[in-house]
């Protein structure tokens, strides 16, 4: 039930998130002249629909930058929808963690067929959509099916903290390789004060060994990144992520990050 609400949600001033169109969330950050899109979902169609929804409510603006937070397909596979958007800027910047392209292609191309078959069982894809069949995946309703695409980053995040400005918006990035994904980042917006936890934080105990065959996660290292984010982004007033819903309030954010850190220790 908690994953069921879908639509466009305001997370912080100038920061909106579309939930319920894919297993992951698509985030739109308002820049000086356009949008920064974070994690353009898993397929072209599931990314195009949230972008259209955002335009209906937030107005038309060119996409100036895209951030791939990590190397799992549900966070980059819909990039073609951004390229196909008539409002996209010609000099689009694509930010990703160092090692993103290698990790994404090795997992989704070289091992893609085997992982795809296992994912059918892991996510219960053939089950009927009812109370006795497919209900939820925990992280979201269900993985998308459709055309998957990828793009080469123009800017790499390779250290912590790494400051960057995208269309007038100040970002502080955390480089978190070998956490929930082989290549991953999180970030903080020091002006609006939201912290984006990518997928190193969630509303469930995330799997350390995925049945579909993704690389095994180092729980202690992962926990260390969450603790680093808790200290680095201590002024955060909101924490939100690639899946599920935000936590509001500075004290609640600190408590949530501490609980997530301890979960993986």
Region locations from a protein language model:
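Active-site metal-binding motif and surrounding structural segment of the metallo-beta-lactamase
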Residues: 8, 33-34, 44-94, 158
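Divalent-metal (often Zn2+) His-rich catalytic cores of metallo-beta-lactamase-fold enzymes
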Residues: 163, 188, 194, 204, ...
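Conserved beta-strand hairpin/beta-sheet module of binuclear metal-dependent hydrolase folds
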Residues: 5-60, 185-199
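Metallo-beta-lactamase
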Residues: 10-11, 95, 101-177, 221-233
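Second-shell loop/turn segments in exported
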Residues: 37-42, 66, 209-215, 254-257
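Active-site neighborhood of phospho(di)ester-bond hydrolases with catalytic His/Asp-centered motifs
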Residues: 38-40, 62-74, 95-97, 196-198, ...
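Active-site environment of divalent metal-dependent phosphoester hydrolases
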Residues: 45, 71-77, 101-104, 180-182, ...
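N-terminal pre-domain segments of enzymes
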Residues: 1-5, 226
């Amino acid at each position: 039930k908690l994953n069921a609400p879908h639509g466009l949600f305001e997370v912080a001033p100038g920061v909106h998130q579309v939930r319920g169109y894919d297993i992951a969330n698509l985030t739109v950050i308002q820049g000086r002249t356009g949008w920064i899109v974070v994690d353009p979902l898993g397929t072209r169609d599931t990314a195009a629909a949230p972008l259209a929804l955002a335009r209906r409510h937030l107005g038309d603006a060119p996409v100036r930058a895209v951030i791939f937070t990590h190397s799992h397909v549900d966070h980059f596979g819909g990039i073609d929808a951004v390229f196909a958007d008539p409002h996209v800027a010609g000099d689009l910047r694509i930010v990703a963690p160092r090692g993103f392209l290698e990790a994404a292609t090795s997992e989704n191309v070289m091992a893609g067929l085997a992982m795809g078959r296992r994912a059918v069982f892991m996510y219960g894809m053939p089950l009927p959509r009812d109370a006795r069949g497919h209900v939820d995946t925990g992280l979201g309703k269900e993985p998308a099916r459709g055309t998957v695409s990828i793009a080469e980053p123009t800017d790499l995040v390779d250290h912590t903290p790494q400051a960057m400005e995208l269309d007038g918006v100040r970002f502080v990035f955390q480089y978190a390789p070998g956490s929930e994904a082989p290549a991953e980042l999180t970030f903080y917006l020091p002006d609006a004060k939201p912290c984006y936890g990518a997928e190193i934080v969630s509303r469930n105990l995330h799997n350390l060994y995925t049945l579909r065959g993704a690389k095994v996660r180092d729980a202690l290292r992962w926990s260390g990144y969450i603790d680093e984010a808790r200290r680095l982004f201590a002024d955060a007033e909101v924490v939100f992520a690639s899946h599920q819903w935000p936590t509001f309030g500075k004290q609640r954010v600190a408590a949530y990050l501490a609980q997530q850190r301890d979960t993986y220790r």
